[in-house]
Design a protein with these regions (language model features):
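Short, well-structured N-terminal submotif of metal-dependent ribonuclease cores
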Residues: 1-60, 66-90, 192-195
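Acidic, PIN/NYN-like endoribonuclease modules and their adjacent C-terminal/linker elements
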Residues: 1-12, 16, 143-145, 156-201
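Helix-adjacent hinge/juxtasegments
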Residues: 82-102, 106-109
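Acidic catalytic patch
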Residues: 60, 103-145
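Conserved glycosyltransferase catalytic-site signature
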Residues: 21, 58, 150-156
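A conserved hydrophobic position in a structured secondary element of the catalytic/binding core
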Residues: 19, 56, 130, 169, ...
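A short acidic, often aromatic-flanked loop/helix-cap motif at beta-alpha or helix-coil junctions
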Residues: 62-63, 130-136, 189-196
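Short, flexible loop segments at the rims of nucleotide/cofactor-binding pockets, characterized by
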Residues: 30-33, 142-147
């Protein structure tokens, strides 16, 4: 479909929606933006009312785990902007703390995903796999939309392959996506910036 819309303009009716990493991170309050978190919660509630399904892709689960590991690393190192050299140094001088840091981040992510899998309208397992055809499709989508990260192309390819109706995100890079039978939905702030960029604000 031709352009992104805000979450609150979607009509969920026995639909299937895929949630990307940015949406999940905001839903889980990882980013600390209470306004966007509420919008994500409202979108989930609308799906429940509309008897729709929310899916979490294998790529989103992987990236969410990475976010929580990075958060645990930042906490252990007591610095937000750490480098790979910082991590290597920690692994060398305190391997036990390094291992604990990875375990903590991984466990926190697993708990967050498990809680979502037990909550309506989420499916109770990860959706989609990354196969050769997924990679080929992602490469085509990357050429088409010039995403800054190939991971974005993989997210979109998984959504397209699984024929979902909606793709929920708070990432501005998906606003230009125009794929048949797929509607991208974003938060109001992201949508406002997108419309302003188009000169329609």
């Amino acid at each position: 479909m031709s352009e992104a819309l805000p979450f609150d303009r979607a009509y969920f009716n026995s639909s299937i929606a895929m949630c990307d990493t940015s949406f999940l991170a905001n839903l889980l309050a990882y980013n600390g933006n209470s306004t966007v978190q509420q919008e994500c919660q409202d979108a989930i509630y609308s799906m429940v009312v509309g008897k729709s399904i929310a899916a979490i892709s294998v790529k989103a689960a992987e990236e969410l785990t990475g976010l929580y590991i990075r958060s645990a690393q930042a906490e252990a190192l007591a610095k937000k902007d750490f480098t790979q050299e910082d991590l290597k140094a920690m692994r060398d001088y305190d391997p036990a703390l390094y291992k604990k840091m990875i375990e903590n981040g991984t466990s926190t992510a697993a708990e967050a995903l498990s809680a979502l899998f037990k909550t309506k309208p989420f499916l109770d397992e990860i959706t989609g796999t990354v196969t050769n055809s997924t990679i080929v499709l992602a490469q085509e989508l990357n050429k088409k939309y010039s995403f800054p990260s190939f991971n974005d192309s993989l997210h979109l390819a998984i959504a397209v392959e699984n024929k979902v109706d909606f793709f929920l995100t708070t990432d501005k890079d998906f606003c230009n996506v125009n794929e048949p039978n797929l509607q991208v939905l974003v938060d109001n702030t992201t949508y406002g910036k997108y419309i302003k960029r188009l000169g329609r604000a």
